[in-house]
Amino acid sequence: MAKERIVLPSAEFKKNSNITLKDYKSLYKESIENPNKFWAKEANRLTWFKKWTKVLNHDFKNAKVEWFKGGKLNVSYNCLDRHISTPLKNKAALIWEGDNPSESKVLTYYDVYREVNRFANVLKKYGVKKGDRVLVYLPMIPELAITILACTRIGAIHSVVFGGFSPEALQSRIDDCKPKLIVTADGGFRGGKPIELKRNVDIALEKSKEDVKTVIVVRRTGNESGLVWKDGRDYWYHFLISDPDLSPYCKPESMDAEDPLFILYTSGSTGKPKGVLHTTGGYLLGVNLTFHYVFDIKPEDTYWCTADIGWVTGHSYLVYGPLSNGASSVMFEGVPSYPDAGRFWDVIDKYGVNIFYTAPTAIRALMREGLTHVQKRNLSSLRLLGSVGEPINPEAWEWYFKIIGKEKCPIVDTWWQTETGSIMITALPGAIPQKPGSATLPFFGVQPVLVDNDGKEINDKGEVSGNLCIKSPWPSMMRGVYGDSKRFFDTYFSQFKGYYFTGDGARRDKDGYYWITGRVDDVINVSGHRIGSAEVESALVENRSVAEAAVVGFPHDIKGQGIYAYVTVKEGIATNDTLKKELVAIVEKVIGKIARPDVIHWAPSLPKTRSGKIMRRILRKIASGEFEGLGDTSTLADPSVVQKLIEDKRKFHS
């Protein structure tokens, strides 16, 4: 392995940080040794209508967990009501930036409160009650945040479906969660192009076995040509919310801490969507506490998480974490490349963003564009950077740190999952020294362990690798797969008894820092040696010609598995044998000869989901010469990428 660099927080950041290293160590110790005491104290960060009867009740072996049972609270009350009787009433809650740079809007806490109350009453008027599901299929506009907060106000369970998903993907989610009502828009904009939404809902409902009686439509594009309207089912949002007879106040429903809050679907390996179910009290406490410490939030900060609310990052760190802390949260409808590759930097400059949280995929794409766009903008307001979604390779980390953060902004490289609800392993800026590429140390209450394939904990000192599991419950963890308790147990608790299995592999270094090596099915077993795909990818992108790389295993006659690398080069770089040799050499240098790629496949681009994750399942099949039965590809941003890779592979074979 290359020598690890340690980056210390600056003296100034350290001085003003929300937590010190000493406090982190003592609080972490308490959170593991006495979780009941620790979480009872931290739960006071929220406003409760009634105190719980017991902090924690669990049987991890049988996947049973309850936090704050009997405690009563309401999420929208914690995000809105408790702020509007304070000076936060007129503070910006949501700063909305449209796809087109000419469109923007600022909503104060009172603005959001007023709109949420009115829309909650609309939902009630159309028969939505506590426990009913509301499916939300909207672009990144303020009404999306307003809708989910209105659901929480009346105790309805929201299920947000990313606006880029197809009618088929939408239908499968409708069939699974059986919504009482759907909220959508006439359409949306993404990268200057219109996107279909209402039409997709119409198609999905036509094919669905569910009889959804009400569809509420937000006017976003104003383009009604081709819009099919079903009287008695379809209603305009703006007409309903501006009804003069609508009460301006909706009393927040008193919810048990364990009442369901939302369902969020993730891709399952079987192709059937997996509805991750989160509950009210533990989830809200998890996102509230992590937001405060991980992002070192201050009252005057402007914070921007670039994620879509269709993904868990948008739920936790665009809406619920920031608003429950009384922060100002930027909400962006567009893409980083429109109208040009300087758009992210424009938004930071325009709003004086202090904290910026984005994905390595975006960082690598912007890195590929060079410095021109960055140098034209003023990024001096930034004081903290974050990364989410996948491990960030050290080269991208260094670029982010030096070019965007000007070597003064710590980077929080956060590891967590849709299933965990909130950040699990991370640096705490100002307290914990960072190592580029490492997710760092566990957050309070999180007890990660590495286990071998027989389920035995690996407790050796020094550097070790294994399957990343969590040993004990944490408040924001998922409570089930919606409507399928067997699948919940089988997926997360059956492989290693008594542990929550994350599905990821990791190594722990001599300092206790965790390095995520990729999904366990992304671990390649070469001649009995376990090679993490993320490690090989990191080595490949150290070469200045490489923009991005994805590495998978494929059947090898001698080694069992060989290493197959898909490599995308930067603009203007020629692909040739000389570059191939350089790439093999750099992998040998950084990891060792055992990790040298057997095949380098030049890829103009990689197949990604709309949230930016590389679909490795498809890459593995292509590498193995399996071109049929690629499984569910409905989440792909650009299906033509797959076709091109298959054509290239066929040529390579012939």
UniProtKB/Swiss-Prot annotation:
Modified residues (N6-acetyllysine): K613
EC id: 6.2.1.1
Residues noted as binding ATP in the record, renumbered to the chain: G389, E390, P391, D413, T414, W415, W416, Q417, T418, D504, R519, R530
Gene Ontology BP terms: acetyl-CoA biosynthetic process from acetate
Catalysed reaction, written as an equation: acetate + ATP + CoA = acetyl-CoA + AMP + diphosphate
Binding site for Mg(2+): V541, V546
Keywords associated with the record: Acetylation, ATP-binding, Ligase, Magnesium, Metal-binding, Nucleotide-binding
Domain of life: Bacteria
Ligand binding (CoA): R190, G191, G192, K193, T313, S527
Keyword Ligase listed: yes
UniProt keyword Metal-binding present: yes
A GO MF label: ATP binding
UniProt GO cellular component terms: cytosol
NCBIfam families, per database record: Ac_CoA_lig_AcsA (TIGR02188), PRK00174.1 (NF001208)
Function: Catalyzes the conversion of acetate into acetyl-CoA (AcCoA), an essential intermediate at the junction of anabolic and catabolic pathways. AcsA undergoes a two-step reaction. In the first half reaction, AcsA combines acetate with ATP to form acetyl-adenylate (AcAMP) intermediate. In the second half reaction, it can then transfer the acetyl group from AcAMP to the sulfhydryl group of CoA, forming the product AcCoA.
PANTHER family: ACETYL-COENZYME A SYNTHETASE, ACETYL-COENZYME A SYNTHETASE 1
Family that this chain belongs to: Belongs to the ATP-dependent AMP-binding enzyme family.
Protein name: Acetyl-coenzyme A synthetase
Organism: Leptospira borgpetersenii serovar Hardjo-bovis (strain L550)
